[in-house]
Design a protein with these regions (language model features):
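Formylglycine-dependent sulfatase
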Residues: 1-174
Length: 174
């Protein structure tokens, strides 16, 4: 490994069009992502062999196709993967941290990350599970409920987020 290894920030968004960045000529305002793109590497010919969130994350995590992970649609990421990118980066001396939606089972499995902070979009698979986002939300909006915005986690329509922008899950994740 080089004396000063490069910093790696991998951002994976659900259902994000490849051209939906200001730096790609889109009128959307995305200054922070544009800066990361200009100072880092912007992949313009990316391809997802399975354009669904959980299978796509499994492919990225393992370096395998959906046919090899067994995830051709929504389902659980295999628990025992031979190779996992976060663990491989750990083995090279990197500190790895996952934040946001993972949709793994069990939900707190780390898949090689040193730490994870989870926002599971309201998905609770174990009685004792509480997402880190919801804990944070309660600290910042006591008595509030992130599910009262009128916008579902997987709605097919857009809407205005009715709470303060600072409380949005995307803001928390970033």
């Amino acid at each position: 490994m080089a004396a000063t290894p490069p910093h790696i920030i991998l951002i994976m968004t659900d259902q994000h069009r490849g051209d939906a960045l200001g730096c790609m000529g889109n009128p959307v305002i995305s200054p922070n992502l544009d800066q990361l793109a200009s100072e880092g590497t912007l992949y313009t010919k990316g391809y997802s062999s399975c354009p669904s969130s959980t299978p796509a994350r499994a492919c990225l995590l393992t370096g395998q196709s959906p046919w090899h992970t067994g995830l051709l649609g929504y389902g659980n990421v295999p628990v025992n993967c031979q190779y996992e990118m976060p663990q491989m980066l750990r083995d090279l001396g990197y500190y790895t941290f996952g934040i946001g939606k993972m949709h793994w089972h069990p939900q707190r499995i780390k898949h090689g990350f040193h730490e994870v902070l989870l926002d599971e979009s309201g998905r609770i698979e174990a009685e004792n599970f509480e997402s880190d986002y919801r804990k944070w939300f309660q600290l910042n909006c006591p008595g509030g409920n992130p599910d009262t915005t009128g916008i579902g986690w997987n709605d097919h329509q857009a809407g205005i987020y009715k709470l303060k922008e600072e409380l949005h899950p995307t803001r928390w994740t970033s």
